[in-house]
A protein has these predicted regions:
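Switch II (G3) loop of P-loop NTPases
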Residues: 58, 98, 102-125
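Glycine-rich phosphate-binding P-loop
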Residues: 5-19
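Inter-motif core of Ras-like GTPase G domains
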Residues: 125-148
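Structural motif
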Residues: 5, 113-115, 142-144, 173
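C-terminal lobe/tail of nucleotide-utilizing enzymes
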Residues: 159-230
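Short, high-confidence coil segments that cap the C-terminus of an alpha-helix
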Residues: 1, 31-32, 107-110
Length: 230
């Protein structure tokens, strides 16, 4: 099972959209593909269960049958930073539980995409961040860059942090989130020249996002490694 961690330059920059697009791309190619989002905020009660809209989208596009609590073991109702939610609910993240789920997925999937919450450096608890989670899982990263004014600074700082931690950046996706952004092409060209990892694609601004439509702009073959990690 090839496993990748999807992180981003910020919150609300389309990580779930790109995660779903990657899953859609590979399911259309005949692979068994699933997604996971270990931590989700802004959840709501549906049919007596806490659920995240992001997690629902991931489950809907995946073509493997997985329990929703395995896709998303930590759900919080308030749309606030996760370390605050963990503290308010007196919870700690259990990396062994997440690894247990990953091992259980191994015989069900060819590919698994794990979506983080917020940006790369966001704290999950007071002493444990998304970056720490990636390190603990020891899996390569696909970075989603939300292309808007200021994205160059966000992207370069995030890439610098990833590389300083000696983590593997397998590729990145430019996701246009501002349809009125000036000099869009020039910004993406600069990022392609300065991010030392392959650009898997530049997804245009799509008012009504469709993962299958967006997947046409992504080239999975450009990933610079395929390590069977789980």
């Amino acid at each position: 099972m090839y496993t990748y961690f999807i992180t981003g330059t910020d919150t609300n920059i389309g990580k779930t959209a790109i995660t779903c697009s990657l899953i859609a791309k590979l399911t259309e190619e005949g692979f068994c593909v699933g997604g996971m989002k270990p931590v989700a905020a802004g959840c709501h009660i549906e049919n007596g269960h806490m659920i995240s809209d992001d997690v629902k989208k991931i489950a809907e596009v995946s073509n493997v049958d997985i329990n929703i609590n395995e896709i998303n073991p930590y759900q919080f109702e308030a749309p606030i930073a996760p370390h605050i939610s963990f503290k308010k609910n007196k919870k700690e993240i259990d990396i062994h539980l997440i690894k247990k789920y990953l091992r259980s997925f191994e015989n069900k999937m060819d590919y698994l995409f794990i979506e983080g919450v917020g940006g790369y450096a966001v704290p999950l608890t007071e002493n444990f961040s998304t970056a720490n989670l990636i390190e603990a899982l020891n899996i390569p990263i696909i970075l989603v860059v939300g292309v808007k004014l200021g994205c160059i600074n966000h992207a370069l700082l995030t890439v610098e942090s990833i590389l300083n931690k000696k983590q593997k950046l397998s590729g990145w996706v430019a996701n246009r989130i501002d349809g009125h952004m000036l000099a869009y092409d020039e910004n993406v060209s600069f990022l392609k020249e300065n991010i030392k990892a392959p650009c898997l694609g530049a997804v245009p601004y799509l008012k009504n996002f469709d993962p299958y439509r967006a997947s046409k702009f992504i080239d999975i073959a450009k990933l610079n490694d395929k390590v069977d990690l789980y």
